[in-house]
Every structure is written in C-alpha cells, then in structure tokens.
C-alpha cells in the first residue's frame, strides 16, 4: 500500500476504528471497489451497495435509511467526489433529522473509474472525467448543516474520523487523494473474468513503466 492518504488506507482505518461493527454504504466507482476489498466484513447486512448498477448518488440516501433504522449503529457512506455531487443536497435532510451518519469523500478530482479505463484502455484520451474545478465540499456540507473537514494526510484522517465517531449530527470528511490512484484487479473491455489483471501484469505489458 502506498504512503500518504489513499482509498485503501481510509477503508482499512475505518475498519480498525469501528472494530468492524459499522454499516458501510457505498456510491459507485473506485471507492466502491476499495470498500469491498479493504473492509473485512463478517456480519450480514453491513455492506449496502448498488453493485454493478452504476447508480451514482445511491449511497447518501441509503445511509440516511440505514441510520434511521439503526440509530445506535455507526453508518459510514463512502463516496467519490463525482458521486457526492449527485445527491449531496440530502445532507440537509440528514442534518434536519439529526442523523449522525459519516460521509467519507474519496476525493481524487476525477471520475476515477472511468478515468482509469481511459488511462489503461484508451491511450489516456481523457474526456469528461476531470472535476478539478475548485468546488469546496467542506463549505457545501457546512451550508447544509453538517460538520465537515478536509484531510490530506493519514494523521489528519484518523483525527477527523475519531471526531466523526463522537458526533451527534452528520459529519463529512473530504479526503484528498492522488488522481492517478487505481483499483486492481481490472478486466479489459470485452474480456472474460479469467483474464483479469493486476498492476504488476499491466506494468509488464508496458515494459515495466
């Protein structure tokens, strides 16, 4: 795992700090894969995700429902910055209802999964995937009644998440990660699952680069 703040680190730290007892919810994209790979689920009904349906914006509404049904449980929605834009207005609902859900934004300033495909399979012809437009998710979240922090290091995330666990109202953590972070393994377009490949396989096809 790379040094510094990354999607896998965030998910593993959430698992550690919740002792595996959280209800995890996801949006759609790279963060969804990391949430599936790096949180060690051992109990039923603790991962709420729309699977392969591609429903960006699903997670926050699902987290509101999960928190309403389980007021004494820790509910964490894992979102990308692209997904957060789809349904972030529902933070106002969570604030009005005083729901202590935790919204963790894995913010790489791109539509990460689509951009990864463009990198690996379309010669880095990036189209409609860059979101680096300066939107301040902390201020947006605060405007809708949530507590919010931006974090750029592992230490900052750990402190922010500890504070989020103690909060009685919605808490948003905007985690800044590298735009080129990738999720592995991958399956190329039109290929079967038994031809999936990881980063080492991919680098071998690129001459080790």
PLM regions and their residue ranges:
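A short acidic, glycine-rich active-site loop
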Residues: 50-53, 123-132, 199, 203-206
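Short gly/pro/ser/thr-enriched loop/turn and capping motifs at secondary-structure boundaries
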Residues: 32-33, 54-56, 84-85, 109-113, ...
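Short coil/turn connectors at secondary-structure junctions
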Residues: 19-22, 42-45, 70-75, 88, ...
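Conserved thiamine diphosphate
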Residues: 69-160
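Active-site diphosphate/adenylate-binding microenvironment
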Residues: 1-66
